[in-house]
From Swiss-Prot:
Organism: Azotobacter vinelandii (strain DJ / ATCC BAA-1303)
Subunit structure as annotated in this protein's UniProt entry: Part of the 50S ribosomal subunit.
Origin organism lineage: Bacteria, Pseudomonadati, Pseudomonadota, Gammaproteobacteria, Pseudomonadales
Gene that encodes it: rplD
GO biological process, one term: translation
Protein family membership: Belongs to the universal ribosomal protein uL4 family.
Name of protein: Large ribosomal subunit protein uL4
Annotated stretches, region: Disordered: 38-75
Alphabetized NCBIfam families for the sequence: rplD_bact (TIGR03953)
GO CC annotation terms, alphabetical: ribonucleoprotein complex; ribosome
Annotated InterPro entries: Ribosomal_uL4, Ribosomal_uL4-like, Ribosomal_uL4_dom_sf
Length: 200
C-alpha cells in the first residue's frame, strides 16, 4: 500500500503494519497494561495491627455498663486502624511481545484510516525555540500533535517541551497511549521505515 507524504511523492509501506484491521480488544488490553505498569503501587495504610498502642483494654470486661472493648485501636475508634488497609502491590500486567506489536500495528493502521497520520520527509527546527516550532506546526495545520522521528532531535525536544499539546518521541519511545492520545501523529519517513522493521 502507499502512504501520502506531505509535499513529496507517496511511499510504499507494508500493508501488515499500516493497513491491518483494527483489533479493539487487543488495543484496550495493551493500553490497560501500559497504564498499569506506570502505577507506583507503594500506597500503604495502617490496619489495627500496625497502629501503635491498643495493647491494654480500655476498661474492664464487666461492671461498667459500657459495651465491652478489648482494644482502643479497632476500626470503629478514633485513632484506630483502617478496616481494609491498602497494601503495596505490583500492578504490572503481562503482555506478550507479539500482542504488544500487534496492538501497535492495529493503532497505526487505524490512524491511517482516520487520516490522523501525517507523514513528512523530515521534521526539525534550527534552534530550540518554541515560537519557531509553533510556526512550523501552524503551517501544517497542526496543534494537538505527537511528533515521531527515528531519533529525537535535541532542538526539537527542547522547542516542544513547553507546549502542552505537543510531544516528541522516537520510534522506540512510542507507546499505545501516546499514539492515540493526540489528534494527529506527525511521523517522518525514516520513522515509518523503522516502524516497519520493528513491527513487520
Amino acid at each position: 500500500m502507499q502512504l501520502n507524504v506531505n509535499g513529496a511523492q507517496a511511499i510504499e509501506v507494508s500493508e501488515r503494519t499500516f493497513g491491518g484491521e483494527f483489533n479493539e480488544t487487543l488495543v484496550h488490553q495493551a493500553v490497560v497494561a501500559y497504564l498499569a505498569g506506570g502505577r507506583q503501587g507503594s500506597k500503604q495504610q495502617k490496619n489495627r495491627s500496625d497502629v501503635s498502642g491498643g495493647g491494654k483494654r480500655p476498661w474492664r470486661q464487666k461492671g461498667t455498663g459500657r459495651a465491652r472493648a478489648g482494644t482502643s485501636r479497632g476500626p470503629l475508634w478514633r485513632g484506630g486502624g483502617v478496616t481494609f488497609a491498602a497494601r503495596p502491590q505490583n500492578h504490572d500486567q503481562k503482555l506478550n511481545k507479539k500482542m504488544y506489536r500487534a496492538a501497535l500495528r492495529s493503532i497505526l493502521s487505524e490512524l491511517v484510516r482516520q487520516e490522523r497520520l501525517v507523514v513528512v520527509e523530515d521534521f526539525a527546527v534550527d534552534a530550540p525555540k518554541t515560537k519557531s516550532l509553533v510556526s512550523k506546526l501552524g503551517g501544517l495545520g497542526l496543534s494537538d500533535v505527537l511528533i515521531v522521528s527515528d531519533a529525537v532531535d535535541q532542538n526539537l525536544y527542547l522547542a516542544a517541551r513547553n507546549l502542552p499539546h505537543v510531544d516528541v518521541r522516537d520510534v522506540l519511545g512510542s507507546d499505545p497511549v501516546s499514539l492515540i492520545a493526540y489528534d494527529k501523529v506527525l511521523i517522518t519517513v525514516p520513522a515509518v521505515k523503522k516502524f516497519e522493521e520493528l513491527l513487520g
